[in-house]
């Protein structure tokens, strides 16, 4: 099946060890409706020899029922897994696929192109390192191209590959490729991606997807797969500012007290002097414990347990940073917010805000402006609707550690949770922390006020505070 099938058959331990050492690249495909996103992923899997024979046979059978490619196998059916997607020939939900080559491991997020699924795309893009934006060579840059480029930029994706697809339908015209390239360059001036690539391709026939095509002799660049295998992403991670959100306090016996979590950014070493926020108490890292034994240092992405030389008060939701860090606490911040609920957002309504492992009540105090993701124009709004993106002022009841999202994606992101249904209704990216303000109580629902009164009446020993 794959490039490593022989190694799997002869030495599974060697294969697993080699696979574990490979660097992981997460990327998403996005573009206008029917630009060929799912077909491109199917082509990547097919040409990388990552499809089993029975899968290929099933797709060949489904092509006669749902396919849109005539006599050719519709590789998009490898990815469009929902029955509604196959019947409509579109992508609705974010579809994830996993594959690897000799050089890297990959997780692909195939995101929907329709405007009503903007929230789905934002979800898929939030963990990606690279975006593949497809453009139909016949139509050029479309409204949805602008929207997806803006969302990719907003969510901190630094590497963008503009895949100008269906070049076979314009006879692999170099002038058409250059025209679309210039049009996108004009668009990207306001988005400032760190790295931008352009590839002419035909996902249906495989031109410049995995292998360089003979039908584009005028193109001297890399194929899409070559770009995916070689793009430099290690430097994208914040290795300077140590951030460790505490997820769990591990106390199996009286002789051990460790703080479990995943290093969000930076590096920590045994002997480093650290500080716990919000308390501000300091101590020294005594040991770094993992399932496989103790480490001398831990870096971004590693799940570890820290033990400290001193008994200081740390609980779930606290943040451990280096002692000399100038990180400040704030209960007020300015942020981009993607609204994901059918119920509109009005300033002043109480929600829960989750930053890493920290959860605190708060409100959106003000909507500064809404961004039209199709034109990039700004407008004043009194409420946010489903799929809206706006810059807002958030006020929290407790102070939190937050970094600018563009500087640190792990500690600059947050989600908004409905207090009654526990459903995630928004995703936020911090722009900057503002000076702390007096904690705001927000607007409570009639049910919350009545429940609070009931608790205070019948359970006075709980010391519940009056609300509303």
Curated annotation (Swiss-Prot):
Residues annotated as signal peptide: none
Keyword ATP-binding: yes
Region annotation (G4) ranges: 165-168
Name of the top EC class for this enzyme: transferase
Domain tr-type G per the UniProt entry, residue ranges: 22-239
Family named by the database record: Belongs to the TRAFAC class translation factor GTPase superfamily. Classic translation factor GTPase family. CysN/NodQ subfamily.
Protein name: Sulfate adenylyltransferase subunit 1
Gene giving rise to this polypeptide: cysN
């Amino acid at each position: 099946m794959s490039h490593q099938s022989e190694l799997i058959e002869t030495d599974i331990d060697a294969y697993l060890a080699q696979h574990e050492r490979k660097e992981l690249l997460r990327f998403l495909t996005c573009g206008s409706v029917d630009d060929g996103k799912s077909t491109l992923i199917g082509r990547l899997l097919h040409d990388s020899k990552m499809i089993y024979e029975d899968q290929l046979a099933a797709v060949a059978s489904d092509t006669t029922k749902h396919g849109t490619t005539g006599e050719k196998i519709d590789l998009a059916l490898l990815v469009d897994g929902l029955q509604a997607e196959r019947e409509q020939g579109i992508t609705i939900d974010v579809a994830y696929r996993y594959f690897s080559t000799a050089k890297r491991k990959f997780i692909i997020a195939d995101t929907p192109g329709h405007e009503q699924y903007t929230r789905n795309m934002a979800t898929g893009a939030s963990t990606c390192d690279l975006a593949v934006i497809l453009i139909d060579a016949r139509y050029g840059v479309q409204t949805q191209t602008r929207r997806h480029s803006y969302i990719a930029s907003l969510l901190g994706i630094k590497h963008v590959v503009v895949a100008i697809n269906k070049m076979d339908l314009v006879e692999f015209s170099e002038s058409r490729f250059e025209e679309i390239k210039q049009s996108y360059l004009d668009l990207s001036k306001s988005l400032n991606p760190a790295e931008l690539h352009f590839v002419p391709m035909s996902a249906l026939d495989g031109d410049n997807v995995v292998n360089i095509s003979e039908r584009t002799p005028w193109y001297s660049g890399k194929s899409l797969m070559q770009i995916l295998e070689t793009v430099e992403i290690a430097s994208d991670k914040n290795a300077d500012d140590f951030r460790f959100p505490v997820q769990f306090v591990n106390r199996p016996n009286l002789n051990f007290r460790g703080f479990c979590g995943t290093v969000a950014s930076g590096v920590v070493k045994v002997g480093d002097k650290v500080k716990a926020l919000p308390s501000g108490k300091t101590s020294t890292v005594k040991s770094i414990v993992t399932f496989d034994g103790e480490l001398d240092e831990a870096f971004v992405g590693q799940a570890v347990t820290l033990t400290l030389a001193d008994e200081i008060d740390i609980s779930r939701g606290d943040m451990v940073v280096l002692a000399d860090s100038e990180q400040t606490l704030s209960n007020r911040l300015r942020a981009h917010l993607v609204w994901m609920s059918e119920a509109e957002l009005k300033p002043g309504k109480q929600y829960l805000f989750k930053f890493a492992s920290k959860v605190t009540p708060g409100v959106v105090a003000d909507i500064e402006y809404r961004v039209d993701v199709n034109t990039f124009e700004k407008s004043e709004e009194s409420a946010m609707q489903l799929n809206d993106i706006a810059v807002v002022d958030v006020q929290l009841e407790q102070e939190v550690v937050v970094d600018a999202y563009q500087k640190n994606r792990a500690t600059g992101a947050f989600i908004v949770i409905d207090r009654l249904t526990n459903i995630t209704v928004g995703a936020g990216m911090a722009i900057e922390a503002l000076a702390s303000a007096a904690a705001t109580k927000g607007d409570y629902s009639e049910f919350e006020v009545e429940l609070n009164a009931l608790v205070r009446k019948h359970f006075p020993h709980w010391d519940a505070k009056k609300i509303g």
